[in-house]
Design a protein with these regions (language model features):
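Hydrophobic transmembrane alpha-helices and their helix-loop junctions in integral membrane proteins
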Residues: 1-232, 241-243, 249
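Hard-cation-handling environments
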Residues: 226-278
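Generic leucine side-chain signal with a strong bias for well-ordered alpha-helical environments
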Residues: 237, 285-287
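Conserved small/polar residues in nucleotide/adenosyl-binding loops
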Residues: 276-283, 294
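Hydrophobic alpha-helical segments, chiefly the membrane-spanning helices
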Residues: 288-294
Length: 294
């Protein structure tokens, strides 16, 4: 709970975002804070022997996903909003672990690493552009000055909210559907509500930063529309955008239908025939997307 910043031990993670943005992207979004998720998944045979602990994990994850999404809504520091978003997404993974959906937890861990790292790096690009200003109430109108960062942030945001075809759609919706299917009504409803909070705080950042009015001093506003940040800052955005959008599409089969984790995780009900029928509608969408790309 502490390592993956779950309620009530989540307070350390937003404060750790005071460091450099690349550190936030690499460690706090993709690796370090997910160690707790990996540990529970790796020890899944042991946790399967303790039903009470699994139910506790399920409710902790659901509460974290919803509660921290609400906290993100009232933040104005761009990095803190993304930090609370990270905790909320870790709640999805924790809830999946509590429902014995270990493959789905690892699925979301993988997809989340890419689009959340992209969001952090886009935030860093924005902060540099705005002379280290992080308050989104003072930042605005960057769409015409930072077109590459704008597009990268948009794709990462779509994946975060679970827009169809993006990586986040496959991993998040799979977790929510599976938890609802197996009868966990209260966690299911909390995760559904967290979708709305995720959409709200993501839209808050996106439209305020790229379409709002800037209140920065005139000497800090850059009126040159061609002045994007250096190539060294833009290259990682290109690298992370593709997996943020398409990764879920290509690893859906080995994780959801295949047996990638059969020797390491105690995956049980995920591959039942009844659950396969439940997922038929999403599998059909998955096949349509594959055909469109091919």
């Amino acid at each position: 709970m502490a390592k993956s910043a779950q309620v009530p031990l989540q307070f350390w993670l937003p404060d750790s975002m005071e460091g450099p943005t690349p550190i936030s992207a690499l460690i706090h979004a993709a690796t370090m804070v997910t160690a707790g998720i990996y540990m529970v998944a790796r020890l899944s045979p042991l946790y399967e022997l303790t039903d009470g602990v699994l139910i506790f994990i399920l409710y902790v994850g659901s509460i974290t996903a919803f509660f921290l999404g609400l906290v993100a809504l009232v933040q104005n520091d761009i990095k803190r909003i993304i930090a609370y978003s990270t905790i909320s997404q870790l709640g999805y993974m924790t809830a999946a672990l509590g429902a014995s959906l270990y493959s789905l937890a690892m699925f979301h861990l993988i997809t989340h690493a890419f689009f959340k790292a992209l969001l952090f790096l886009c935030a860093g690009s924005i902060i540099i552009k705005c002379h280290h200003e992080q308050d989104i109430r003072k930042i605005g109108g960057l769409r015409k000055y930072m077109p590459i960062t704008y597009l990268a942030f948009m794709y990462a945001s779509l994946s975060l909210i679970g827009f169809p075809i993006t990586s986040g759609f496959y991993s998040k919706e799979s977790i929510i559907d599976a938890i609802g299917y197996f009868g966990h009504t209260i966690p299911y409803l909390m995760l559904l509500l967290s979708i709305f909070t995720t959409t709200l705080y993501t839209s808050k950042i996106f439209f305020k930063v790229f379409f709002g009015e800037s209140t920065l001093p005139k000497e800090e506003q850059n009126d040159n529309p061609k002045n994007e940040n250096d190539r060294q800052m833009l290259l990682p955005l290109f690298v992370l955008t593709a997996p943020s959008v398409f990764l879920g599409l290509f690893i859906y089969d080995p994780l959801m239908i295949g047996i990638l984790f059969q020797n390491s995780l105690a995956a049980n009900e995920l591959m039942t025939v009844s659950y396969t029928h439940l997922r038929a509608h999403e599998t059909s969408l998955h096949l349509v997307c594959r055909l469109l790309l091919e």
